[in-house]
Regions:
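Basic/aromatic-enriched alpha-helical hairpins
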Residues: 1-57
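Glycine- and acidic
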Residues: 10-11, 52-60, 128, 159-163
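Hydrophobic (often cysteine-bearing) scaffold residues that line and stabilize catalytic clefts
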Residues: 17, 21, 63, 67-70, ...
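N-terminal DNA-binding recognition helix of tyrosine site-specific recombinases/integrases
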Residues: 27-30, 40-42, 56-90, 138-140
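Contiguous, well-ordered alpha-helical segments that form the cores/surfaces of helical PPI scaffolds
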Residues: 51-52, 73, 131-136
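Conserved helix-loop functional segments at active or binding sites
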Residues: 56, 80, 113-120, 151
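Basic, Lys/Arg- and aromatic-enriched nucleic-acid-binding interface segment
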Residues: 86-142, 146
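Conserved tyrosine-mediated DNA breakage-rejoining catalytic core shared by Y-recombinases
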Residues: 147-179
Length: 179
């Protein structure tokens, strides 16, 4: 993927996507033992070995899939622009699906300790207050909390668009969050 496309993604505010593309490319070139891989060097066998390398490095299936999908996207752009030869079912032998993972929730005891244990410093007290607020705002992400504006609050309801997905959200403010 040319650097201009990475720049375009960043200009569009898609920093996370650009970051994932960068990581996938870096990982693949590292696996190949070079700083640049030509499209003709990307084969079904090399991709299969790369997938095995990722798994043996301790990566989870969804991470391996993400890297493979990024490489496939780069390859497809190369084919569309005429810079890469079309290879039928090039990514057929590698995993590009998405595993449904069990959400990782804190046990109740740990959550209580996080939210209510007396912090050892003022800095930790502030961090604890922010964590409690995010929890009371239905698990709002820190990025979303940081981008909230006063205009987002209307009659005990916060309305905002998720930073990552632009999905509209509405969260009722609990009485405990007003303290």
């Amino acid at each position: 993927l040319p650097e201009s496309n990475m720049g375009r993604l960043r200009k569009e505010g898609r920093h996370s996507t650009a970051h994932v593309y960068t990581n996938a490319l870096f990982s693949f070139t590292k696996f190949c033992g070079t700083t640049h891989v030509a499209f003709r060097q990307v084969t079904r066998e090399r991709l299969r070995c790369y997938g095995q390398y990722l798994y043996s490095s301790g990566l989870k299936p969804n991470t391996v899939s993400t890297y493979m999908r990024m490489l496939r996207s780069i390859y497809n752009r190369g084919v569309e622009s005429g810079r890469a030869p079309y290879v039928h079912r090039l990514f057929h032998d590698v995993y590009t699906g998405v595993d449904i993972c069990q959400k990782k929730a804190l046990p109740v005891g740990e959550l209580n300790r996080l939210l209510y244990e007396d912090p050892k410093s003022e800095r930790l007290r502030r961090t604890q207050a922010i964590a409690a607020l995010m929890f009371q705002f239905c698990g709002m992400s820190f990025a979303d909390l940081a981008h909230l504006e006063k205009s987002s609050l209307e009659r005990n309801i916060i309305r905002y668009n998720r930073i990552k997905t632009k999905t509209p959200m509405s969260v009722e403010i609990l009485d405990t969050a007003k303290e």
